[in-house]
């Protein structure tokens, strides 16, 4: 919700969301609730893209499509109104600069991979809005600062302000404005937490959100 709010979504906005994990999917749902007329989801896991489509988003598989070209075409050559990077430093692009980021990480130079954020900045329209809920743990280079300045973009990021949002979001869940159940892929007893984390990391197409329940029978 905060990711969508940071994107300052207005009625009839076109919004692009990178990443269809739990954060990205909830950002998609939130953007639609806030009045976006069009939401475009970018990922490559089929099941996660299917969940985004189920919510009402149009989908782009970044392994099959040039994302920036597709977004420019879908927005009439202008660029989308707002972009949300729900990927962060785990971004896996195919551009040559992303390969350099991987090499630098291997040798301990610690550059975060930021291909999703770079795509987002280049795909948003002039005067557009950039929201960054995706986590970046260190430093990144090849930042498209020139494009950001030239376009006059608004950039906001940060982890969710839990105390600010918890009460209002629980109310929206209770009154049916938001649905959280669609995202739950697995329910496990608390004793299987380690196994759940391992599967979530290694099988991201099938595992989206795990509920751990103390006392649950195996």
For each predicted feature, which ranges?
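Residues in the short beta-alpha loop(s) of Rossmann-like NAD(P)-binding domains
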Residues: 45, 136, 161
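Rossmann-like dinucleotide-binding domain for NAD(H)/NADP(H)
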Residues: 155-156, 172
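C-terminal hydrophobic helical "lid"/dimerization subdomain
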Residues: 78, 118, 162-218
């Amino acid at each position: 919700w905060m990711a969508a709010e940071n994107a300052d979504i207005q009625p009839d906005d076109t919004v692009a969301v990178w990443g269809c994990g739990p954060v990205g999917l909830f950002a998609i749902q939130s953007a639609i609730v806030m009045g976006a007329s069009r939401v475009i989801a970018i990922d490559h896991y089929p099941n996660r893209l299917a969940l985004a489509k189920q919510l009402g988003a149009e989908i782009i598989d970044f392994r099959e499509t040039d994302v920036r070209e597709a977004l420019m075409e879908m927005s009439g050559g202008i660029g989308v109104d707002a972009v949300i990077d729900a990927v962060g430093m785990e971004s896996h692009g195919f551009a040559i600069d992303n390969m350099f980021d991987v090499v630098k990480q291997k040798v301990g130079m610690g550059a975060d991979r930021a291909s999703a954020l770079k795509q987002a900045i280049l795909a948003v329209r002039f005067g557009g809005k950039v929201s960054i809920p995706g986590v970046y743990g260190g430093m990144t280079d090849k930042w498209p600062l020139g494009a950001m300045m030239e376009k006059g973009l608004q950039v906001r990021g940060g982890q969710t302000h839990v105390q600010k949002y918890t009460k209002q979001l629980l109310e929206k869940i209770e009154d049916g404005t938001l649905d959280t159940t669609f995202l739950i892929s697995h329910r496990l007893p608390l004793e299987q937490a380690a196994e759940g984390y391992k599967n979530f990391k290694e099988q991201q197409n099938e595992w989206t959100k795990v509920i751990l329940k103390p006392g649950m029978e195996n």
